[in-house]
Amino acid sequence: MRPATLRQCFGVCIGAVLISSCSTGGQTVDSADSEAGARWTNCVVSGAIEGRQIRIVSTVAPITSLIAQVVGESGAEVTGLVPEGTNSHTFEPPPSAAQVLEAADVVFMNGLVLEEPTRDLAESNVGDDTVLCELGTSILPPEKWIFDFSFPRDGGKPNPHLWTNPPMAASYVDVIRDVVSQLDPGNADDYAANAEELLRIIGELDSAMK
């Protein structure tokens, strides 16, 4: 497959992969040692959901698309809170999002201080057993956070756009697969197969870009 075709395929699979026209503010990073921070980083599943399809809530469009590719046609409900093309750095969730978050079995966010208003709303509305998972924060420890011209270190916010990096996007897929498989073990084989195919595409794209 030619590189151009690979890029197109990967774009279809994960949505607007290269959306990065965002600006940053001066908010400081929350402590990763806090109890709430650990919950988001560890992505702990307390038990499987029985008797119904799992309910998944996510934030930015690229992450929502990755999740949709992994769950496939399992029947899992996937709701993305941030409309495609929206500046996720300035997005404020509407009041109606509280009800969506309250019903969620898992909330996937990017993390890395990207969606703080949505994170705050989630923490105020989700149940004790809801899985809270910041994909970026879970795979990239603070000492490896990336700061650059648009995201200076003194601003306190790292560059959160890890999904534009194929190996890191692959790590997102691994975490998503593991979490939804624990929540819905009856569809775990399908989730694994879907993730394997997506990882294959990501790997081919990575090779073509080198």
Name each region found by the language model:
Residues 11, 22-210:
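Extracytoplasmic metal-acquisition and chelation regions
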Residues 1-12:
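Bacterial N-terminal signal peptides that target proteins for export
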